[in-house]
């Protein structure tokens, strides 16, 4: 029986989506622009031989209609295409859920006011239920900038830092030692229950350490509290069929722990990839290994650091042969993304972009998949791969994969 491995390169968009104008994202192209920024700073094109060989650069140039500056480019030996998003938003849950067959066709709740951002009744109830002395922030903010601005006051007062963004999200930052990690999680759980009626997609715990605003840094103990997907996803269907659904990184949180049979955490890009390789050695047949590579988005996309993003992508490319060499004959590798986050774009938010659809099996030859009308095409393909009932959304391309070897 078959296995599948998904490497979700969080935020690796490859060109503005057809509806990018509705999001203020005309001209966005995460991959092409970080490659250009790297070239402009270093004078050399980034070498991504393994991702190039799988078709990532072909997909980016087809989707974004602009050149991708890479060296050591070789002909594709994988199936490659690009998908537009059917969901109404450009957020993390929408992208992940749609990829698993459940697009978000409703509108999330948001906090549109930049400051103060949150309803006073909600703040009052959160304080009453948790016993916190108040909150700091109450605004739209960059998660790193707000630590510099309010971290010391938080440590002195015990008031957690609460902030949001253009996404449907409520984020709480607190010091792991002075405030306490478990206390932070408890406050987040209370906030989650209060925000359900507002249809806020995620509450995120953002713990940090450090002694002053010069060295405050987030830790790896982030936790996401998502609402439940509105319908069963591919993960639920596979788990119900007796399969293993192995979450690595924040995947389990994003799917609100639905359809997950194993949960594994690892700090940082390379450790996430190493954990993936480790579990590929032991995962039984009829398993899905699903890894979110969050650093691309969190460390470089939102922080608008294109050269750092490029260097991280190079680390991914360098490790990729280890993953490829671990593939068995009946394994299918998928590399994709959940949205864009162009590090050269104004602001600090996600960007509405096409995402890569890369599929690879040992022995595969070049096969263009073209433009896909939904991220759900990936989920439908995996349903076919695992011989599961068809999902409601998505146009599978398994026939192209099985005839291309």
Curated annotation (Swiss-Prot):
Pfam families: Metalloenzyme. It is found in: Cytoplasm. Pathway: Carbohydrate degradation; 2-deoxy-D-ribose 1-phosphate degradation; D-glyceraldehyde 3-phosphate and acetaldehyde from 2-deoxy-alpha-D-ribose 1-phosphate: step 1/2. Binds 2 manganese ions. One of its GO terms (biological process) is nucleotide metabolic process. Mn(2+) 2 binds at residues 297, 302, 350. Keywords: Cytoplasm, Isomerase, Manganese, Metal-binding. Its EC number is 5.4.2.7. It is an enzyme of class 5 (isomerase). InterPro entries: Alkaline_phosphatase_core_sf, DeoB, Metalloenzyme, Phosphopentomutase_DeoB_cap_sf. Mn(2+) 1 binds at residues 10, 338-339. Belongs to the phosphopentomutase family. PANTHER family: PHOSPHOPENTOMUTASE. This is Phosphopentomutase. It comes from Pseudoalteromonas translucida (strain TAC 125). The gene is deoB.
